Regions:
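PLP-dependent amino-acid enzyme catalytic core
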Residues: 1-350
Length: 350
């Protein structure tokens, strides 16, 4: 059985992936001393800048506070975001299990960064197709195009709340299906295959279920879909690597993740889910606090609380707390830290 699985691996693709991508991202390697994290991203003490920002921007005096704040700078990763972690782990596993071979197409619904991370595969000869919303910022479209990613843009939100039956009528679903068919044809996909599944496609579009639309298109066209919203490797990348990595870096500072709270936003739930599990398993504590923008605010790639509820990896019982933060109030902080030379984005500011 193991021999058959080994024979099913595209070893040339695996070697190229490991040389050009895997060896540049954080992952576990075994040596004589055991498993260790390699290619860790910087964990930077930003306490002084944080206190200065509090005073100058928000008129809060934290000078006498014992507060200690670190920032995890995943902007140093290839393509510049934390999404490289789950993307690399999912693709590595897919190659190792024979689900991806040279020349194959990868298709995924994305609000930006995960799709951009998948763009690394283009240099390996894999075609990447992303399903995105036309509401995306132009800068995201520019980055996707720069990575040689094929784009299918829809007049729908890629991150709606799950189970939105009745929110789009049949005429809208049919019009969107026709648009998708046209774009697939331009990308040289056989439209007759699409037509054979039109009923199921229109049902998904009527619910604005773009996540499962990507899965269906991958299935009928024999492509690979990473399924970032439902793939346990998304969470596991942060449980086994990101959590251990931060803890290892804090230990080098004479501290421990056990003594810190982690603040993060919610996109797929991979980061919050993985870090929650790591801390729970190792320290039997809840330390992850999840931040949401209020309803109606559009923060790139980040869900509101209502749009997170119902997703597989939204697990509030594992969090230490949940909060809504007005992104308008976070914008001055974003500007302050960028001017200080910290390469952070909207989600970090929130």
């Amino acid at each position: 059985m193991e021999q058959n699985q080994d024979n099913n691996i595209d070893k040339v693709l695996l070697q190229r992936f490991e040389e050009e991508i895997w060896n540049k991202v954080p992952h576990l390697e075994n040596d004589k001393q055991g498993a260790k994290i390699v290619n860790a991203t910087p964990l930077v003490d930003i306490t002084n800048d944080f206190k200065e920002c509090a005073k100058k921007v928000y008129n809060l005096d934290l000078s006498n506070s014992e507060l200690q704040v670190y920032g995890k700078l995943d902007s140093t990763l290839p393509t510049g975001s934390i999404k490289v972690r789950p993307a690399a782990n999912i693709i590595h596993d897919a190659i190792m299990t024979g689900k991806i071979k040279s020349g194959q197409t990868v298709i995924e619904a994305t609000s930006g960064n995960f799709g951009i991370a998948l763009g690394m595969l283009s240099k390996l000869g894999l075609q990447v197709v992303t399903i995105v919303s036309r509401k995306l910022q132009e800068g995201v479209f520019h980055e996707l195009r720069n990575m040689n990613i094929k784009i299918m843009d829809l007049e729908m939100d890629i991150c709606p709340a799950p189970g939105m039956e009745g929110k789009k009528d049949e005429l809208v679903a049919k019009a969107t299906a026709a648009n998708i068919r046209s774009q697939l044809t331009q990308l040289e996909f056989d439209p007759s295959i699409f037509d054979n599944s039109i009923t199921e496609i229109e049902k998904l579009l009527a619910k604005q279920d773009i996540i499962n639309l990507a899965k269906l298109l991958a299935k009928i066209y024999n492509c690979f879909c990473p399924e970032q919203y439902d793939n346990d490797l998304n969470v596991n990348a942060h449980r086994t690597i990101t959590g251990s990595e931060i803890d290892q870096q804090l230990h080098e500072e004479g501290n421990s993740l056990e003594n810190f709270n982690i603040l993060c936003t919610f996109g797929t739930g991979g980061t919050s889910g993985g870090l929650s599990r790591y801390i729970s398993e190792k320290y039997n504590k809840k330390r992850v606090h999840v931040i949401f923008p209020p309803g109606g605010q559009d923060v790139a790639g980040i869900r509101t609380h209502n749009n997170a509820d119902g997703l597989k990896y939204y697990q509030p019982d594992n969090y230490a707390g949940e909060y809504e933060v007005d992104f308008e109030k976070a914008k001055p902080l974003l500007k302050f830290f960028v001017e200080k030379g910290h390469d952070i984005g909207e989600s970090s500011a929130l």
